[in-house]
């Protein structure tokens, strides 16, 4: 059951990242008005994610993998909320958003597979490790498909027209879908993960106490 909870948390986190990925072209072109910079923004985002991967590994050693993942979700929320307040011509501010959200992406690429590997090893589920990793890959791909199924009809219902003049309501819907909905999903993911950490601690502590008692020397003959 814990494996499926971790997969659900990962799914929420990936869905939060996938919605902006689906809408980024619309956001940059139709809201920011800087279509010519789309490629540079994407490059900045992915380079930030790749460069952050060693940093997240180091942080996971210092703080713990689950704790580091919680922190990365909060960092992603900071980036997404910042994007909500942007408007036409705010390309420098959006570049900062790309860096911040890219840094958070590095954690999503690094930590979940490692956390799942630790879980498999701790619970002696090595016989099912292939299935678990296959599910991890499936969840990532399904999240992208689900993001398209949610975001695009939502924009269409609000009257948003790509590459055209749009009403304030349509652009506001775009901002909400691009920034606030992912923020809510990331916060939910962080909350579930934090709850998982709290539930895991008593068992870990008990295990350490039990292990210590088993190795305590006996005073009986």
Language-model segments: which ranges?
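Membrane-embedded alpha-helical bundles of multi-pass transporters/translocases
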Residues: 1-221
């Amino acid at each position: 059951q814990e494996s499926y909870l971790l997969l659900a948390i990962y799914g929420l986190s990936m869905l939060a990242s996938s919605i902006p990925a689906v809408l980024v072209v619309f956001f940059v072109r139709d809201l920011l008005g800087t279509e010519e910079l789309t490629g540079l923004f994407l490059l900045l985002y992915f380079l930030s994610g790749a460069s952050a991967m060693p940093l997240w590994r180091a942080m996971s050693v210092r703080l713990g993998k689950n704790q580091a993942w919680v922190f990365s979700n909060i960092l992603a929320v900071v980036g997404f909320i910042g994007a909500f307040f942007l408007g036409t011509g705010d390309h420098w501010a959006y570049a900062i958003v790309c860096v911040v959200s890219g840094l958070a992406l590095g954690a999503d690429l690094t930590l979940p597979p490692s956390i799942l590997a630790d879980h498999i090893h701790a619970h002696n589920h090595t016989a099912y490790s292939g299935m678990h990793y296959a599910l991890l890959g499936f969840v990532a791909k399904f999240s992208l498909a689900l993001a398209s199924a949610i975001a695009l009809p939502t924009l269409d219902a609000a009257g948003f027209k790509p590459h055209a003049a749009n009403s304030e309501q349509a652009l506001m819907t775009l901002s909400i879908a691009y920034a606030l909905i992912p923020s809510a999903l990331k916060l939910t993911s962080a909350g579930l993960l934090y709850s998982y950490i709290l539930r895991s601690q008593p068992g870990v502590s008990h295990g350490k106490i039990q292990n210590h008692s088993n190795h305590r020397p006996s005073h009986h003959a």
